[in-house]
């Protein structure tokens, strides 16, 4: 029986502005799981723009091994879980009726055309049913129902006929936290607001939420403690593929290109090293390599942090504009032997990259792939390239970038858009499905978070995500840093191997520096 939909309440308070979100996270969240910090910075000036922190989550929704798990984390979330369960259609199987609720959606038929598959019942409808459980979202601020978390690369196997691979890690196919307590820092205007969302009519629970607001206001009024930096004697770095092995993969991939099966593919490799204190490593990474998207996700079984230069998918519900930001073409920054920046050398490297036929061909191919992805979901005549072949600079590398936008069809939402576009072409290649098949064969294991997307969406339908690159996935105090290179016909194997190392370098160095140790290469 369907239950009455929820009327939410939102409580807000302004708190003392403090400019270091990582220090706030360290003081307020500490090692608490189901917490998340999302930050943004200007691409060129590197000024910090906004930080959003899920301090308390009411509910967690995740998907792994074809099972959706919805867990209420507070009494506030229990009420929402009850209404959500009543909205499920009969063809959704309830495997466990308790908290956490475990459900299974029908397997998507691979014989439907693209549009039919977009409209078919899928695991994304679990998120839609959660949002539909609330009836008065439009009365409140846009972030009153705020979900933050991860779509993994391997989520694609639920929508395309791709191999199911093994993994030793515990990364779900998607994992999102529904915020109960959200901190929003506006670094431009130097404001700090704590938002608490109530999903219940229980007066005792509402009082607890209001009390929580006051407790946090008091905590945030005090000076912050510095982040603890652990020291390790030495740090061993090892890789699952040597340069020689990776070069052989590139040579083999080029055979498929010559045969006409693909135009490009993006094989990756994994670097491993100890990471005792991920938060301190994240602090060093964002200081040395400020990026448009920076993130620190703390789950029970893993921690994920990074500083990504590349948007995955961005959607504005008000203008209905959908955006992809392809990055393809990479060079190291022009630095002297002592590590200082040589501006003349940096400019010459940029000029070489901008005029390199191989890099331009690869980049334009991926711009075209982004155009094709958006064509599936946009109103006719609205898709276009807003920016073509600009250069973005970061601490260790520079990139060729473009921006492709369009207006989402009125019969689709942000989840349809993500389903149609995943995974981003800059992490797969083209044609996309065949490239992903080859990646499965080459790599032989799940990618997990790498190449997926992390960010947030709201109950009103806003979406902002970045591609999970320049990141570390930490489990059992071991960090996995994954990086790849786009292989085309003109690729030189050793140069592509070097590129994959350059992409991983900023994160590896941040982990080493935060633990005050030298890296021993194995």
Curated annotation (Swiss-Prot):
Pfam families, sorted: Anth_synt_I_N, Chorismate_bind
Entry keywords, A to Z: Amino-acid biosynthesis, Aromatic amino acid biosynthesis, Lyase, Magnesium, Metal-binding, Tryptophan biosynthesis
GO MF annotation, one: anthranilate synthase activity
Superkingdom to which the source organism belongs: Bacteria
Any one of the GO BP annotations: L-tryptophan biosynthetic process
Activity regulation description: Feedback inhibited by tryptophan.
InterPro entries named in the record: ADC_synthase (IPR005801), Anth_synth_I-like (IPR019999), Anth_synth_I_N (IPR006805), Anth_synth_I_TrpE (IPR005257), Chorismate_C (IPR015890)
Cofactor: Mg(2+)
EC number in record: 4.1.3.27
Cofactor: record remark: Binds 1 Mg(2+) ion per subunit.
Pathway: Amino-acid biosynthesis; L-tryptophan biosynthesis; L-tryptophan from chorismate: step 1/5
Binding site for L-tryptophan: 40, 292-294
UniProt binding sites for chorismate: 329-330, 450, 470, 484-486
Catalytically driven reaction(s): chorismate + L-glutamine = anthranilate + pyruvate + L-glutamate + H(+)
Quaternary context: Heterotetramer consisting of two non-identical subunits: a beta subunit (TrpG) and a large alpha subunit (TrpE).
Family from the record: Belongs to the anthranilate synthase component I family.
Function: Part of a heterotetrameric complex that catalyzes the two-step biosynthesis of anthranilate, an intermediate in the biosynthesis of L-tryptophan. In the first step, the glutamine-binding beta subunit (TrpG) of anthranilate synthase (AS) provides the glutamine amidotransferase activity which generates ammonia as a substrate that, along with chorismate, is used in the second step, catalyzed by the large alpha subunit of AS (TrpE) to produce anthranilate. In the absence of TrpG, TrpE can synthesize anthranilate directly from chorismate and high concentrations of ammonia.
NCBIfam families in the cross-refs: PRK13564.1, trpE_proteo
Protein name stated in the entry: Anthranilate synthase component 1
Native organism taxonomy: Bacteria, Pseudomonadati, Pseudomonadota, Gammaproteobacteria, Enterobacterales
């Amino acid at each position: 029986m369907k239950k009455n939909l929820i009327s939410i309440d939102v409580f807000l308070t302004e708190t003392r502005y403090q400019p270091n979100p990582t220090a706030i996270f360290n003081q307020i969240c500490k090692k608490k799981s189901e917490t998340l910090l999302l930050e943004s910075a200007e691409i060129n000036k590197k000024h910090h723009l906004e930080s959003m922190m899920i301090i308390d989550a009411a509910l967690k929704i995740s998907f792994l091994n074809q099972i959706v798990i919805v867990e209420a984390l507070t009494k506030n979330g229990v009420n929402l879980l009850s209404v959500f369960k009543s909205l499920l259609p009969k063809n959704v199987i309830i495997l466990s009726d308790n908290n956490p609720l475990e459900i299974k959606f029908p397997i998507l038929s691979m014989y439907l055309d693209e549009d039919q598959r977009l409209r078919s019942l899928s695991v994304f409808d679990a998120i839609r049913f959660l949002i539909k459980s609330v009836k008065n979202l439009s009365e409140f601020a846009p972030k009153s129902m705020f979900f933050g978390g991860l779509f993994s690369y391997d989520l694609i196997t639920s929508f395309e006929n791709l191999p199911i691979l093994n993994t030793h890690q515990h990364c779900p196919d998607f994992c999102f936290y529904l915020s109960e307590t959200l901190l929003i820092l506006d670094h431009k205007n130097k404001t700090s607001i704590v938002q608490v969302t109530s999903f219940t009519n229980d007066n005792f629970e509402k009082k607890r939420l209001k009390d929580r607001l006051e407790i946090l206001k008091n905590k945030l009024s005090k000076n912050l403690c510095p982040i603890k930096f652990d020291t390790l004697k030495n740090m061993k770095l090892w890789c699952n593929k040597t340069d020689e092995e990776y070069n052989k993969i590139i040579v083999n991939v080029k055979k498929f290109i010559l045969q006409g099966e693909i135009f490009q593919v993006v094989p990756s490799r994994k670097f491993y090293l100890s990471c005792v204190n991920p938060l301190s490593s994240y602090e060093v990474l964002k200081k040395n390599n400020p990026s448009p998207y920076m993130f620190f996700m703390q789950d029970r079984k893993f921690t994920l942090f990074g500083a990504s230069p590349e948007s995955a998918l961005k959607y504005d519900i008000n203008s209905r504009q959908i955006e992809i930001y392809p990055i393809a073409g990479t060079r190291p920054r022009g630095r002297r032997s002592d590590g200082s920046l040589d501006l003349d050398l940096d400019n010459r490297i940029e000029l070489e990259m901008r005029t390199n036929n191989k890099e331009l061909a690869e980049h334009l191919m991926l711009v075209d792939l982004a155009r094709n992805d958006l064509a599936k979901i946009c109103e006719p005549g609205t898709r276009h390239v807003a920016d073509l072949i600009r250069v973005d600079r970061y601490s260790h590398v520079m990139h060729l970038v473009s921006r492709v936008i369009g207006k989402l069809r009125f019969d689709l939402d942000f989840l349809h858009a993500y389903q149609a576009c995943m995974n981003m072409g800059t992490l797969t290649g083209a044609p996309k499905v065949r490239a992903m098949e080859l990646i499965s064969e080459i790599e032989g294991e799940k990618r997990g978070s790498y190449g997926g997307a992390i960010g947030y969406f709201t109950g009103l339908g806003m979406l902002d995500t970045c591609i999970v690159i320049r990141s570390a996935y930490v489990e059992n105090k071991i960090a996995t840093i994954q990086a790849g290179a786009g292989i085309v016909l003109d690729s030189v194997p050793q140069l592509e191997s070097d590129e994959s190392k350059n992409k991983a370098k900023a994160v590896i160095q941040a982990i080493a520096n935060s633990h005050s140790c030298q890296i021993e290469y194995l």
